[in-house]
UniProtKB/Swiss-Prot annotation:
Entry GO CC: bacterial-type flagellum basal body; plasma membrane
Protein name: Flagellar motor switch protein FliN
Free-text function comment from the UniProt entry: FliM is one of 2 proteins (FliG, FliN) that might form a switch complex that is proposed to be located at the base of the basal body. This complex interacts with the CheY and CheZ chemotaxis proteins, in addition to contacting components of the motor that determine the direction of flagellar rotation (Potential).
Subcellular location: Cell inner membrane; Bacterial flagellum basal body
Topology of the protein relative to the lipid bilayer: Peripheral membrane protein
Species lineage: Bacteria, Pseudomonadati, Aquificota, Aquificia, Aquificales
Length: 112
């Protein structure tokens, strides 16, 4: 019985191949900061959504210069800020040097 126990314990020891795999895993560990720095130059599309409106094709065809499309938001409502189509924040429209900008007011937590 004692011999069987020794055999089982010896079987549990890592083989040389398993030791190499463990060493490679250690080499591959990269800090989150290094990972972010590595990918920080990747371009992403930032989209600001002021509002939406549903119209029929007939209503769209009847529109022309000067037509007004009413959207689903009040002037005081925050706008949606999306990155690559995903809602990440809400903000307020502001004017900066004669151009429109968005001031972030809320960060949207990821929904799971």
């Amino acid at each position: 019985m004692e011999e069987q126990t020794k055999e089982i314990q010896e079987e549990k020891k890592e083989t040389p191949q398993e030791e190499v795999r463990e060493e490679k895993k250690e080499e591959k560990k990269v800090s989150v900061i290094e990972l972010i720095q590595h990918f920080s130059d990747i371009p992403v599309e930032v989209e600001v959504v002021v509002g939406r409106a549903n119209k029929t094709l007939g209503e769209l065809l009847a529109m022309g210069i000067g037509s007004v499309i009413e959207i689903d938001r009040e002037p005081k409502d925050l706008v949606d800020i999306k990155v690559n189509g995903k809602l990440i924040a809400k903000g307020e429209l502001v004017i900066i040097d004669g151009k429109i900008g968005v001031k972030i007011k809320e960060v949207v937590k990821e929904q799971r």
